[in-house]
Amino acid sequence: MAIAKEDILAAVEGMTVLELNELVKAFEEKFGVSAAAVAVAGPAAGGAAAAAEEKTEFTVVLAEAGSNKVAVIKAVRELTGLGLKEAKDLVDGAPKPVKEGVDKAAADEAKKKLEDAGAKVEVK
């Protein structure tokens, strides 16, 4: 009996980020594929025009945890949904990206939350 797509989607929907990461790694090993993003070539001419466009995706980088590391770990967990150990490892390994590919409003909100917790944050 085959498993329906809806059943698979429901199972994936209920997984944590860590479980999804392990699932992707298992797919990579089982089928010999890579989950890396495909690079898309930009326009051949008009490089200056591309630079003039307003940036739409931002990366929030935790530059330094600061003195109140516990509050920063809590803020990272709240923003990312990571578990305690993963959030602590991210904070201990600063500078590291906390959120990637988010819009300006989400980046500013994440920056404010982390700075309120005592961290030094960069938005790139």
From Swiss-Prot:
Known role: Forms part of the ribosomal stalk which helps the ribosome interact with GTP-bound translation factors. Is thus essential for accurate translation.
UniProt keyword annotations, A-Z: Ribonucleoprotein, Ribosomal protein
Keyword Metal-binding: no
Phylogenetic classification of the source organism: Bacteria, Pseudomonadati, Pseudomonadota, Betaproteobacteria, Burkholderiales
Recorded name of the encoding gene: rplL
InterPro entries, per the entry: Ribosomal_bL12, Ribosomal_bL12_C, Ribosomal_bL12_C/ClpS-like, Ribosomal_bL12_oligo, Ribosomal_bL12_oligo_N_sf
Subunit structure: Homodimer. Part of the ribosomal stalk of the 50S ribosomal subunit. Forms a multimeric L10(L12)X complex, where L10 forms an elongated spine to which 2 to 4 L12 dimers bind in a sequential fashion. Binds GTP-bound translation factors.
Parts forming coiled coils: none
Gene Ontology CC terms: cytosolic large ribosomal subunit
GO terms for MF: mRNA binding; structural constituent of ribosome
Highest taxon in the source lineage: Bacteria
Gene3D superfamilies listed in its UniProt record: 3.30.1390.10, Single helix bin (1.20.5.710)
One GO biological process term: translation
Protein's recorded name: Large ribosomal subunit protein bL12
Homology family: Belongs to the bacterial ribosomal protein bL12 family.
